């Protein structure tokens, strides 16, 4: 690296000299090298480098030719093209490669339709992701937010329940956990719970109790096994999924739901079915609707709303994830309203009155 800098400096000097002065400049370096070599510690001061480096500099001087006008134009053109390319790619580099908060999704082989659904989102930032299983096709609103990882909040309970079932902390036949008597802000939480009731009312303490019996090590092993988002559980063990360290993107939510639906995890079928039953919101002749909301609260404000799930019809299965963000009022309930409007207008699901 240092020798390259010295050669570059020599070249800069030669550009300013007349051709007749090249030899004098080279002789100056040779004389300097000769004097330095006679000292007890040649090149100890680092001036000029070692003899091999000095030889390279002399060869550069001997072979130097001033660039012609055409060469200068070509050089400048190459420089400008390189600069333009670097500047053009800079936003992508800074946003995706250097930004660990985005899911690095290889979408090159995916069938994707980019849809503008901004009228549904209003003032909210966020994304809607839909995967059509039968046609192997994606519909995505706002790709940047579709790959942005944020806290899953209560949507994570789908998988936390599955971990507890797999380890026998709860079972499909007996998922009862007694209320400890502590008073919580929601009346439904102040009672004994089963998986069904805890999922319906999104009872935090139930899933925290499951985690406590599992232990952090086992939970982390499962998070890694299924590839849940950024797999980061460095936050407090009682709240790592609530606006803390664990984060996931809408696209990853949909990918995990497809694995849950067809049990790509290879878990016990009865445990998969127990979770599916717990998140089943509606069943009719039109199909079966599964879903889970999530709301992230920071400093008393709801800033992160989720609604994820899938719809099984007679001839297809659709997986979806909606995430909204704002300084306030970004709730799972509002994410649900947005989702249902989109699904209805897409003729995928019409809410039963």
Over which residues does each language-model region extend?
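Short pre-catalytic segments that frame enzyme active sites
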Residues: 95-154, 168
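Hydrophobic topogenic segments
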Residues: 1-99
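Short, well-structured active-site flanking segments
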Residues: 165-182, 268-272
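Structured C-terminal helix/loop/strand segments within mature extracytoplasmic catalytic/sensor domains
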Residues: 94-122, 212-215, 258-284, 296-353
